[in-house]
């Protein structure tokens, strides 16, 4: 794919092998699939369902393909100021990704054929909606960002897709609806936080992240009071959401304090990359609470 100008290389390379693990977890687009699988596991626990492995596999593989496609589409405009290290990484390795993606896509089709019909139906509906989102974001004639924020769309779609494995197996959908809504708010908070931090501005919108994090934490406590105290799976979701909101609140405070003091572009690039990795790592909290429950 020809581009008008060469893209810069990754601005912040790992300084050690240990630090390289979370960096490449992010650059290889493995962060979103990991978060999706962990929260799908949480929803299954809250719904008291044994979700088939194939449904979780479809979620993880499908999420990876969508994020890779989204980042490759983003780099069609190499001079766009919103491009970050993850975009540069995908552009530099686009040939490998173009070779690997069809193989992964074939694997995904095989998994889809083997998944439960109800989950396949719900995933098909979400896939169609996701394609409309892709068109609205990436096709110039259909740009919808001005009247429907991209962060909100991503947050809602991500949460719904994550809930499908457990949701499709339930007879009583309202049992899980409040927890899915809570996670959708958390995903939207995550997306808005990343967007705000990467714009590197200390505008009034930057305070929105902290305010949203407080709202998410309060909603987690409210849901815990109403439902989460009854069973371990429901408690794990509420506790995970509260902890994630608290972590994002803390990261927002770190961004506002540290960024205003730093004047070196290279330091800022390293800092923003670390903050981006930490933002997604903040959503890995179900790993702790569910592991604690199963001990």
In which residue ranges do the predicted regions lie?
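Structural signal for the C-terminal ends of transmembrane alpha-helices
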Residues: 45-47, 112-116, 135-141, 166-170, ...
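Functional transmembrane core segments of multi-pass inner-membrane proteins
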Residues: 151-193, 199
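Catalytic cores of Mg2+-dependent Asp-rich isoprenoid enzymes
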Residues: 2-65, 85, 101-109, 179-182, ...
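Transmembrane alpha-helical segments that form the membrane-embedded catalytic/substrate-channel core
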Residues: 61-76, 128-140, 183-199, 244-256
């Amino acid at each position: 794919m020809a581009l008008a100008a060469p893209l810069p290389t990754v601005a912040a390379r790992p300084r050690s092998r240990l630090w390289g693990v979370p960096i490449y977890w992010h650059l290889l687009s493995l962060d979103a699939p990991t978060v999706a699988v962990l929260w799908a596991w949480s929803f299954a626990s809250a719904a008291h369902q044994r979700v088939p492995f194939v449904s979780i596999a479809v979620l993880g593989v499908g999420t990876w393909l969508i994020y890779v496609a989204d980042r490759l589409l983003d780099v069609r405009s190499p001079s766009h100021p919103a491009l970050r290290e993850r975009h540069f990484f995908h552009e530099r390795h686009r040939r490998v990704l173009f070779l690997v993606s069809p193989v992964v896509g074939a694997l995904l089709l095989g998994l889809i054929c083997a998944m439960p019909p109800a989950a396949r139906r719900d995933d098909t509906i979400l896939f169609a909606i996701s394609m409309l989102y892709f068109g609205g974001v990436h096709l110039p004639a259909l740009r919808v960002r001005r009247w429907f924020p991209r962060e909100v769309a991503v947050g809602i779609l991500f949460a719904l897709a994550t809930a499908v494995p457990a949701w499709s197996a339930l007879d009583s959908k309202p049992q899980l609806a409040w927890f899915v809504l809570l996670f959708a708010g958390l995903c939207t908070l995550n997306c808005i936080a990343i967007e705000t931090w990467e714009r590197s501005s200390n505008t009034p919108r930057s305070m929105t992240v902290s305010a949203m994090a407080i709202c998410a934490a309060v909603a987690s406590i409210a849901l815990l009071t109403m439902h989460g105290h009854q069973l371990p799976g429901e408690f794990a979701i509420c506790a995970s959401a509260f902890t994630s909101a608290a972590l994002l609140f803390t990261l927002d405070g770190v961004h506002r304090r540290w960024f205003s003091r730093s004047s070196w572009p290279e330091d800022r690039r390293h800092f923003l990359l670390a903050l981006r990795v930490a933002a997604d790592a903040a959503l890995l909290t179900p790993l702790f609470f569910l592991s604690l429950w199963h001990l």
